[in-house]
Amino acid sequence: MGQEQDTPWILSTGHISTQKGEDGQQTPKLEHCNSTRLMGHCQKTMNQVVMPKQIVYWKQWLSLRNPILVFLKTRVLKRWRLFSKHEWTS
């Protein structure tokens, strides 16, 4: 239950309604927020995460040993160096 409360759609609801249990007692019931609110939260979270993930994927890709990928890696690195050099000179 504790781990379930850490999920963004439960934390971002902002309200708690109640439900009746079998014994007739009122207990708090967490409701999921609407999809627009959830998407906004996901986009905000993704924006914070995207850049580090891209760097990790890039590093993982560069570490692959497949001959075709080694060729592509070399080609991409050469183009990157040329691009970087061009950026510095302009």
From Swiss-Prot:
GO annotation terms (biological process): symbiont-mediated perturbation of host apoptosis; symbiont-mediated suppression of host cytoplasmic pattern recognition receptor signaling pathway via inhibition of MAVS activity
Chain intervals for the UniProt region annotation (Mitochondrial targeting sequence): 65-87
Residue(s) at site: Low pathogenicity: 66
Domain of life: Viruses
Region (Disordered): 1-29
Assembly and binders: Oligomer. Interacts with human SLC25A6/ANT3 and VDAC1. Interacts with host MAVS.
Stored HAMAP family: INFV_PB1F2
Record protein name field: Protein PB1-F2
Organism expressing this protein natively: Influenza A virus (strain A/Henry/1936 H1N1)
